[in-house]
Each structure stands twice: as structure tokens, then as C-alpha cells.
């Protein structure tokens, strides 16, 4: 095996969202600006409100990007990354299934490392035999938090 990567923390319990988000604030990580990435359904149905409500209670400044479509394109991720660049978050919260989480991860790479050729990076991950690409160090500008709303994709624990 060339490498193994797992999230630093995994909260797995009904109702743990509030506790997990509260750790982003002064209690543990002292983050102040959250960029929430989700899809139109979760945003318009009000499901994203639970995340933004907790962020509001904490006094954390936040903005939302909800233009993620199923099987998001690189153009979608670039649009989100441009908004990130303007907003300057110190935490990115991906809420949804595989599409919002994958789009948010790409946005995160583009935000942290705008010099990276994403097409080259992605192609190296397509063929398991060629996974020798040195992934850029992440987390200098923002930490990444995934809140899965579906079971099955595993996007919350994979790089792409």
C-alpha cells in the first residue's frame, strides 16, 4: 500500500452535529469564518439551516455556496473556489452527499493551492497504479469538515 489517509475525527451519533460544529469555534479550533458547500435541494429544503443556525449561535461569520449539481464539474468547483478566495474562510463545511462533498474538496484544493494543475492531480488518482503524485499540504488556510447526509459514497473520508 502506498498510503492511507483518514479524517482526524469522526463523529458518529444521532444529534452530534451541534457538538462537532461547536468544536470549530473557540472550544477547540478557534475558527471564525465558515464557507458552507451544499446542493440546491438541501439549501432550499431548509436542511442546511441546521448548520447555519449553529454557526449563528456561535457568532461565526459564514456564507453558503449551494450551486452544486449532481456530478459537479470543475467549472462548478472553480466558481466556488473564487467565492472562497473573496470570503477567506478558515473552515470549509461540506454538507450533503457525494456531489457537494467532492465539489467542496476540489474547491478547498483550488483555494489553498491555486497554482496546482487540478487536471493533472485528478488524473493521477484515476489509475491506482499511478498514485505517486505528491498531494499538496492542506489546511494552511482552512480546515475541512464533511457532514454526510447520505450513506454510500464515502466522500467524507476520501481525497476525491
Region roles according to the model:
Residues 1-91:
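ATP/NTP phosphate-donor binding region
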Residues 75-160:
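Glycine/threonine-rich beta-strand-loop-alpha-helix active-site module
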Amino acid at each position: 500500500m502506498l498510503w492511507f489517509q483518514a479524517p482526524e475525527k469522526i463523529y458518529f451519533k444521532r444529534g452530534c452535529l451541534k457538538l462537532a460544529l461547536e468544536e470549530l469555534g473557540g472550544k477547540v479550533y478557534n475558527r471564525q469564518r465558515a464557507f458552507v458547500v451544499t446542493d440546491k435541494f438541501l439549501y432550499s429544503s431548509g436542511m442546511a439551516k441546521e448548520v447555519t443556525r449553529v454557526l449563528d449561535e456561535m457568532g461565526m461569520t459564514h456564507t453558503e455556496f449551494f450551486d452544486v449539481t449532481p456530478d459537479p464539474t470543475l467549472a462548478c468547483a472553480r466558481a466556488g473556489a473564487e467565492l472562497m478566495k473573496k470570503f477567506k474562510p478558515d473552515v470549509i463545511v461540506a454538507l450533503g452527499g457525494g456531489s457537494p462533498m467532492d465539489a467542496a474538496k476540489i474547491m478547498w484544493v483550488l483555494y489553498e493551492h491555486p497554482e496546482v494543475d487540478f487536471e493533472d492531480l485528478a488524473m493521477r488518482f484515476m489509475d491506482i497504479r499511478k498514485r505517486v503524485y505528491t498531494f499538496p499540504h492542506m489546511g494552511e488556510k482552512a480546515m475541512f469538515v464533511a457532514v454526510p447526509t447520505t450513506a454510500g459514497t464515502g466522500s467524507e473520508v476520501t481525497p476525491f
